[in-house]
Design a protein with these regions (language model features):
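Carbohydrate-interacting/catalytic domains
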Residues: 261-264, 278, 359-362
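Charged, low-complexity intrinsically disordered terminal segments
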Residues: 319-329
């Protein structure tokens, strides 16, 4: 094994003696349990030992590049991982990662904190990035593949060219669970809104995430006209940089109106799909962006995009989003969106409902920023 730390460990399997050596001795070491992980903090370094397995809600190896801790964590752990504003910064001390397999522990290498979240000063979640990625063989040993599950299907795709209302309903009810529903299902009440928006609001009563987590469709009480009083604003970017709207009239709504994209000080631009297609595209985009399991390649060429998407199904809609025209590709439990501003360099983002859905992308010859498969 390549030496990644200040103390060489000659074998992959290590024991309490190795832990003591790494942290600087057993006498002054502090021991904690955080989200099922054992954390030993010493004057020299830190050892984090997680359980083998694949539990999205708990601490453990997340991918070949990442290990996650789920808190809350005590103050000593928070200070060691994040540093302390009133004392010497301890966050630069090395962090060693191990995984427990039955009665033995395997040393995986060193890692650095890449992202952490706190609540009232308490560490709640922490992501650490391995300094040297794990091999696929080792990853499968310490994070055994989950058993196969029924993935969201593609029945909805057959309706995109015909019954788009059915396609939207099938995709949202297939992708999102209604376990967190807070309101009973309801039929659409009479409204001046187009049928597509009424349908989305009905679906969102049982599946609130259908209104978006990256960008969002405004709840019905939040709909408003723009500053000129000409357009009904119904969708907004998460930082307020742009919005989507429909032409506002006192007459009844169009059956399938044009959707207008607009930065606040720019002229509006028509989305290429009317509302029925736009809502499918919006739902696909939000599903991929908010997915638990992601695959994010670095910038791709057109040839790489063709290879990246060859095992997937193209969603037969015109490009979404005027800023960077975006196409969607799908497989069971998987949504990929590919965009380009110049037609030469492409950005791709894949989101999956289950880790196994990323399998079609696993062996692609691309440089990954992140791959959760």
């Amino acid at each position: 094994m390549t030496d990644q730390g200040s103390v060489a460990i000659s074998a992959l399997v290590f024991d309490e003696e190795h832990v003591s050596v790494l942290v600087g001795g057993p006498v002054s070491a502090e021991r904690f349990m955080v989200g099922g992980a054992s954390i030993v903090i010493g004057p020299a370094e830190t050892v984090i030992t997680v359980e083998a397995g694949d539990s999205p809600a708990g601490s453990g190896v997340w991918s070949a590049e990442e290990v996650r801790l789920t808190g809350p964590a005590p103050a000593s752990v928070t200070e060691r991982l994040m540093g302390s504003p009133w004392a010497a910064d301890e966050s630069s001390l090395q962090i060693h990662i191990a995984v427990r397999l039955g009665e033995q522990a395997l040393y995986l290498g060193t890692a650095k904190v890449s992202r952490a979240r706190t609540s009232d000063g308490v560490l709640t979640n922490c992501e650490l990035r391995f300094e040297a990625p794990l091999s696929r063989q080792l990853l499968n040993r310490v994070r055994p593949p989950l058993p196969a599950v029924d993935l969201p299907g593609l029945e909805w795709l057959r309706n995109v060219k015909g019954d788009r209302a059915a396609a939207l309903d099938q995709f949202i009810t297939g992708w999102y669970s209604d376990a967190d529903a807070t309101e009973p299902p309801a039929t659409c009440s009479p409204s001046c809104l187009p049928a597509g928006l009424r349908q989305l609001y009905r679906l969102a009563r049982q599946r609130p995430s259908a209104l978006g987590t990256q960008n969002s469709i405004l709840p019905e009480p939040g709909l408003h006209t723009d500053h000129l009083g000409e357009m009904l604003v119904f969708g907004v970017e998460n930082q307020g940089g742009f919005f989507w709207s429909l032409l506002w009239t006192l007459d009844g709504p169009e059956a399938d109106p044009t959707v207008w994209f607009r930065e606040f000080d720019e002229e509006p631009i028509a989305e290429q799909e009317p509302l029925s297609g736009f809502l499918i595209q919006f739902s696909l985009f939000e599903a991929s962006m908010s997915a638990d399991y992601l695959a994010l390649p670095r910038t791709l060429t057109a040839a790489q995009v063709a290879r990246f998407t060859e095992a997937l199904h193209l969603v037969p809609l015109r490009p979404f989003w005027p800023w960077a025209p975006t196409h969607f590709y799908v497989a069971p439990g998987l949504v990929v969106h590919v965009s380009s501003e110049d037609g030469e360099k492409f950005d791709a983002w894949a989101g999956a409902s289950h880790r196994s859905a990323l399998a079609p992308l696993a062996d692609l010859p691309v440089d990954w920023i992140r791959f959760d498969g």
